[in-house]
Every structure is written in structure tokens, then in C-alpha cells.
Amino acid sequence: MSTRAPAIAVLALVAATCAGCAMFGHGDEAYRLSEELGELPGVQGSDVSYVDPRLFESADIRLHVRMRDDATPEQVAAVFVAAYDALTDVHLGEEGTLYVRLRDDRLRLRTFESDAKPSDVEEAALVAAAVAEQQYRTTVDVIARDVDDPPRVRSAVTERVPKGTSAAGVEQARADIEEAYGDLPVTVDIKVALR
């Protein structure tokens, strides 16, 4: 008895399944989401890059938002919540990253099959925007993927302080950031600029 026929049937089934998966990209929705984010208060501009799903790889959506210089922490948080809502609904199962540029600071939201509450993402984004406003050049990651402990959101803050900042100044910056986050999960890294 030949094993060729069952092997061909299995390959045909896999090919049909994979072809079906490839048809379920959400590129149109990603572009609509970018337009919606661009219309939110405090937003100067918005762009998106979207990669359709491939065999054994999920789709990838990257949203880029530039905030106006006078944007408030509440406006930044509204962008995070709108993006998170879409990334955990229409784009569930897709790798999602939101990049927000706020003056000389960078804020980022990372998601993939996340189950954090939008209110927890909003709270982390509010603190991130407030910290960015108060500190020197800051990069804040709001991470809502692979976080097992409640609130299923954690933050990572990197601040680049000016060259010549003393050890006491570095520790004060760290303490200020940790105080701003209170009980929210956060890791803080302070780097002194070399130039």
C-alpha cells in the first residue's frame, strides 16, 4: 500500500489551512485605526506599517503617533487606550506595537494576545506621560504582553540624564520615577549621557 496518497492529502489540508490563515489579515483596519488615532486631540500625526500573517507567523502592526508639543498626559493616555482597544479586539493574535513621540521622549506600548484591562493600560500610560514631562530624555515601555501578575501591565523606564550628573542626581531621578509609579510594576534604568 502506498503512503503517497495520505501524505498528499495531509499536505493539501495544510496548504488549504495556511491559505485560509493568510486571507485573514487586517491591513484595512490597521490603516483606519491609524487615521482614527491621527484625529484624537493632541495628536500631530499618525502612520502605520502592517505586515500580513504568514505561515507560522502572526501579522505585525506598528503604529507611529507624533504628539503635539502641548499634548497633555490625558491625551497621550487616550491614544494608548484607543490603540490597545483595537490591538486586543480586531487585531487580537497579531503582534502590536504603538510608538508615541512626545517632544524628545519616546513612549511605546507592546501587545500580543494581551488580557490587561484598558483602565490599567490607561493608568500606566498616564504615569508614563507625566514622568516623560517631568524628567529629562525618557523612553518608557508599557508592556501588556507576557505579564502574568496583575495588573498584567508593567513599565520599563530609561532616562538619559545630562553629562556630569552626580551619583546623587542619578539616584534622585530614579527615586522620583519610582515614586511617580507608586505600586505599579516598573523597572527604572538611568543612563548618564557621554556627551
Give the label of every model feature segment.
Residues 136-195:
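Extracytoplasmic/periplasmic C-terminal soluble domains
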Residues 19-25:
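Bacterial signal peptide processing site
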Residues 38-46, 91, 130-137:
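Short secondary-structure junctions
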Residues 97-141, 195:
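Surface-exposed beta-loop interaction hotspot
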Residues 42-64, 139-155:
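Short edge beta-strands and adjacent turn/loop segments
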Residues 1-8:
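Bacterial N-terminal signal peptides that target proteins for export
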